[in-house]
Amino acid sequence: MILPEKATLPTMYFIGVTTGKSSIMTLFPYWAKILGINAVIKGIDLPIHADPEDYRAVVDFIKNDPLSLGALVTTHKIDICNAAGDMFDYLDPYAVMFSELSSISKRDGRLEGYAKDPITSGLALEAFLPRDFWDRGGDAYIIGAGGSAISVGSYILGQKKQPGRLVVSNRSAGRLEAIEKMFGKIAPDAKTEYYLAPEAEQADRILESLPPNSLIINATGLGKDRPGSPLSDACIFPEGSYVWEFNYRGDLRFMHQALEQAEKRRLHVEDGWIYFLHGWTQVIAEVFHIEITPEIFSEIEKRSAEICGRKR
């Protein structure tokens, strides 16, 4: 890992794995004009599950460099909190509860960490999921048990209307056990099920157990920083379901698997674009201590779609 040089302009960082491939590097200057902020963005790339000392070095750099104002963290949200949480002067309740952080900022000389994903995943989900969706009798299936899975699962479990079951699968046991304990505290009476599924075919079988009108979410990171899908190409999505690919870039294999079945099985397929926009604007608001109103967000969404050639 190579740390950035000392900032000479107000700087926000993006801590990820392949930050140079993110649309934010192109979009940030346009957003800065809309928001009236004079700042630049730089990426800090770390391997998945990096050395704890590398996480501490990144946090120490931001903490002690005057013009380094903060950062958005992706992929490393749990690991950076576990490795460097003690270096923060303040962690918000979500960061403490979920042992993860997606936002690093400074206020009055204090280094602050926030877990914004429970908010941003909820905003993104509300943008496309019908309000009466859980009246249709479906389940929710979250594939993955990392920070994004924790966030969207906690949001779903915090709503008055809920799925028949919340099902979580993961390829490794440690994080699956951790998310089970966490959700047990958040919603002890909710109907939840947890499955160790190291192979795609095992996730396929879980998928086939879901009733029609379910919500299926890829929260694994596969299809973005790493190619592939948590499902095999033989998977069958339940009819009338909503399929959410958290990623908006990469090979997006999971999303394409759903799109191939969309017409025949009446699927609604979403990528992670709106999640990306909400995720970044929430953290930018924290780093620069500004308010991003719905009107400003709408302007950012419109301009970003134009720049990236996306249909609105």
Roles of regions detected by a PLM:
Residues 4-8, 134-136, 159-161, 209-211, ...:
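Short, conserved loop/helix-junction motifs that constitute active-site signature segments
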Residues 73, 218-222, 245:
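Redox-cofactor binding/interface segments in oxidoreductases and associated redox assembly factors
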Residues 103-106, 223-299:
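Rossmann-fold NAD(P)-binding glycine/threonine-rich loop
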Residues 294-312:
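A short, charged, Gly/Pro-tolerant segment at domain boundaries
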Residues 2-131, 250:
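Phosphate/diphosphate ligand-binding glycine-rich loop within oxidoreductases
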Residues 15-18, 112-118, 132-158, 170-175:
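Glycine-rich adenosine-cofactor-binding loop
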Residues 63, 172-175, 200-231:
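Rossmann-like NAD(P)-binding element
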Residues 161-189, 193:
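NAD(P)-binding Rossmann-fold cofactor-contacting core
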